[in-house]
């Protein structure tokens, strides 16, 4: 049953059901991932009976997501995809000067966790994406001649709240499919402890990013209600265990909100949170993120000088920290801005 859950498992089963040799499945996946063929009818190396069965089961195209709107800036491209049931999600492609291409994909339609500073949460939660819908976002970019150099689960939704996440990562790292290294994938979380623990066991080399945004339990609970279920102190213990087990760095995202979490007291509390945790504490890295304004929230953008001062306080205390370079904010494609705006 598990084998046939995703489209690739179903394709393999289809080859078997038609009593075709196993190499036909290999030909199919090579046509998709080596030759970038998106139309089943165009995979002429396959027998007509198999091509017809594929079209009947999946439709004409390999990728099931349909782009209905796109918006471009100098280094970012935001796409609004429509799914087969009419729901919509957004994904973002980023291109760096060196030619490196990175893609930010969604794991849910909307989000139900209600982080106060995030536009996605204002849309509410509609449903989880399937593993195929998650990976098909990348297939679209791939079929349009983009290089999938790195992937981040930082689009719409909380990745660890979707049980299909790990099937999607399995597809992405399958050497016969996308063939991505685990280290090219980053999963961002607001602190879902069971999800972090499962990642540690199943995909220890996948990068992990944790959304902190306040070092104080009470304020974090106000900004991010999930903190009431998974308190910061417990999340940090889980992150310690992740680092000890994997030897991998954990990235801690901290959105700078003017007058909310940007004080010297906050910076010193972040230092206190990360210092004296153990011999592994150097593997925590703070990623300071300038707030991206939206019409869904009332928070204000923090000045660059204040952010630099906050960063300086962290560095002087021996904390690894950088200020994130933002791309795509002018087209509402940056952190916290994805919210179906273009479907209205």
Curated annotation (Swiss-Prot):
Subcellular location: Cytoplasm
Enzyme active site: 90, 335
Record's catalysed reaction(s): adenosine(2503) in 23S rRNA + 2 reduced [2Fe-2S]-[ferredoxin] + 2 S-adenosyl-L-methionine = 8-methyladenosine(2503) in 23S rRNA + 5'-deoxyadenosine + L-methionine + 2 oxidized [2Fe-2S]-[ferredoxin] + S-adenosyl-L-homocysteine
Keywords from the named record: 4Fe-4S, Antibiotic resistance, Cytoplasm, Disulfide bond, Iron, Iron-sulfur, Metal-binding, Methyltransferase, rRNA processing, S-adenosyl-L-methionine, Transferase
Single GO BP term: response to antibiotic
A cellular-component GO term for this protein: cytoplasm
Disulfide links within the chain: 104-335
Binding site for S-adenosyl-L-methionine: 157-158, 188, 211-213, 292
Pfam name, any one: Radical_SAM
Cofactor field: [4Fe-4S] cluster
Residues reported in the UniProt entry to bind [4Fe-4S] cluster: 111, 115, 118
Enzymatic class: transferase
Residue ranges occupied by any Radical SAM core domain in the UniProt entry: 97-330
Family: Belongs to the radical SAM superfamily. RlmN family. Cfr subfamily.
NCBIfam families per the UniProt record, alphabetical: CfrAB, PRK14453.1, rSAM_Cfr
Miscellaneous comment: Reaction proceeds by a ping-pong mechanism involving intermediate methylation of a conserved cysteine residue.
Reported function: Specifically methylates position 8 of adenine 2503 in 23S rRNA. Confers resistance to some classes of antibiotics.
Protein's UniProt name: Ribosomal RNA large subunit methyltransferase Cfr
Organism: Clostridium botulinum (strain Loch Maree / Type A3)
Upper lineage: Bacteria, Bacillati, Bacillota, Clostridia, Eubacteriales
Protein's gene: cfr
């Amino acid at each position: 049953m598990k084998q046939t859950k995703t489209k690739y498992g179903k394709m393999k089963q289809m080859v078997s059901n038609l009593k075709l040799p196993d190499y036909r499945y290999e030909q199919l996946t090579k046509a998709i991932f080596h030759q970038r063929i998106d139309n089943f009818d165009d995979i002429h190396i396959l027998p007509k009976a198999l091509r017809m069965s594929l079209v009947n089961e999946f439709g004409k195209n390999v990728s099931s997501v349909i782009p209905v709107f796109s918006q471009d800036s100098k280094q970012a491209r935001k796409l609004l995809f429509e799914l087969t049931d009419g729901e919509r999600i957004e994904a973002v492609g980023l291109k760096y000067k060196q030619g490196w291409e990175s893609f930010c994909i969604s794991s849910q339609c909307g989000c139900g966790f209600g982080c106060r500073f995030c536009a996605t949460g204002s849309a509410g939660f509609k449903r989880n994406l399937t593993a195929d819908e998650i990976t098909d976002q990348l297939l679209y970019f791939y079929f349009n001649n983009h290089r999938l150099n790195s992937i981040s689960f930082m689009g719409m939704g909380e990745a660890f709240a979707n049980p299909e996440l790990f099937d999607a990562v399995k597809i992405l790292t399958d050497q016969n499919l996308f063939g991505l290294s685990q280290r090219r994938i980053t999963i961002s979380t607001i602190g879902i402890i069971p999800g972090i623990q499962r990642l540690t066991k199943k995909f220890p080399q996948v990068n992990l990013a944790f959304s902190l945004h306040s070092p104080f339990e009470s304020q974090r609970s106000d900004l991010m209600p999930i903190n009431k279920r998974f308190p910061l102190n417990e999340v940090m213990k889980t992150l310690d265990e992740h680092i000890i087990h994997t030897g991998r760095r954990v990235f801690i995202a901290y959105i700078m909100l003017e007058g909310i979490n940007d004080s010297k007291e906050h910076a010193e509390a972040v230092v206190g949170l990360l210092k004296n945790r153990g011999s592994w504490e150097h593997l925590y890295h703070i990623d300071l993120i300038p707030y991206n304004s939206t019409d869904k929230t009332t928070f204000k953008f923090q000045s660059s000088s204040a952010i630099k001062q906050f960063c300086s306080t962290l560095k002087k205390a021996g904390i690894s920290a950088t200020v994130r370079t933002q791309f795509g904010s002018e087209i509402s494609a940056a952190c916290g801005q994805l919210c179906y705006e273009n479907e209205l």
